[in-house]
Every structure is written in C-alpha cells, then in structure tokens.
Amino acid sequence: MKTMFLLALLAFTATSAVAQLYTTCSQGYGQCQQQPQPQPQPQPQMNTCAAFLQQCIQTPYVQSQMWQASGCQLMRQQCCQPLAQISEQARCQAVCSVSQIIMRQQQGQRFGQPQQQQGQSFGQPQQQVPVEIMRMVLQTLPSMCSVNIPQYCTTTPCSTITPAIYSIPMTATCAGGAC
C-alpha cells in the first residue's frame, strides 16, 4: 500500500511538473528547451561598423599591407561578428543604425558640431538617412560580412523600422511542436 501511494505521488508530481512546464512554455514565460538568441548588440558595435565604412571603405588603399596595418582588418571583424550573430530582421535595424551614425558624423563634420556617440536624445525626431549613405551601407555590409539583409531594408525608411536589434527575445523550441 505504501509503495502504491509513493508511485501515485511520484506520477502525480511528474504529471504536474510536465503540465506546469507546458503551461509556462505555451504562455511564453519559460522555455521547454531554452535556445538563447545572440544577445542584442549595443551601439558600440554599430559605431565600429560606421567607423570601418568611413575609414577603410571610403578611403582608397593602394596596397593591402596598408589596409592590414591600419587596423581595418580588426575593425572589420569587430563589425561583422555581431552582424553574423543577430537575426536577419535585427540586421535591418543594424543597417539603419550604421547609416544614422555615419549621417550624424558627416553632419557634425560639415557644421563643426560634436559627434553624438549614442542614439538620438529622447523626444528628438529621427532624421531621414540620405539615400546615398543607406545605399553605401546596404551595398557594402552584406558582402563584406557575408550576411543576408532582408529585401525590405532597401525600400523601408529607417524611421519606420522598429529597433529589433535591442529587443531580441529568448525563443523556445519544444519537442513535437508543443510550444
């Protein structure tokens, strides 16, 4: 009798745990088999991409040795590695971030204003990125970093793209599609 009671209690506990796991997984609060997405890449990596594009791509180098000696190779790695680790959707926001950084830096140089290292100030309207900057970033980053950028990035203004790069959620993959 005691053995039957223990087996019944064990079965009930296991069933409750599975039901609880399924409930929390299906509600999005937990994960069945947690597979973390790469962490959101903060602004400094996007600054590295912008600096690389401005210093290494827009400036012609005659010899590849100069390119290597200038630190461009390291900057390229620091730019491409985070891009390869984020989702395609988040890469669209990354392209916008790089384009906006370049635009702000060019405006600062043109008007003698200090460069902003972080994003726009709260409440400040986001300016539209000039087409030539966006085109240069879209033509360079995907091939240079061997990553895909969604097609809609070429036609959607940056001001309408949500900052997906800063809000990458954890995903759950469950056996049998239970989640």
From Swiss-Prot:
What molecular function terms (GO) are annotated for this protein? nutrient reservoir activity
Pfam families named in the record: Gliadin
Task: Read off the InterPro entries from this record.
Answer: Bifun_inhib/LTP/seed_sf (IPR036312), Bifunc_inhib/LTP/seed_store (IPR016140), Glia_glutenin (IPR001954)
Q: Which residues form the signal peptide?
A: 1-19
* Modification after translation, per record: Contains 7 disulfide bonds.
Give the keywords, sorted.
Disulfide bond, Seed storage protein, Signal, Storage protein
- Which CDD domains does the entry mention? AAI_SS
The answer to whether UniProt assigns keyword Signal to this entry is yes
Disulfide bond as UniProt keyword: yes
What's the stated role of this polypeptide? Seed storage protein. Not integrated in the gluten polymer through disulfide bonds, unless incorporated by reduction and reoxidation during dough making. Increases dough strength and bread volume, but decreases dough stability when added into a base wheat flour.
Q: Which family is this sequence assigned to?
A: Belongs to the prolamin family.
This one is known as Avenin-like a2
What is the source species? Triticum aestivum
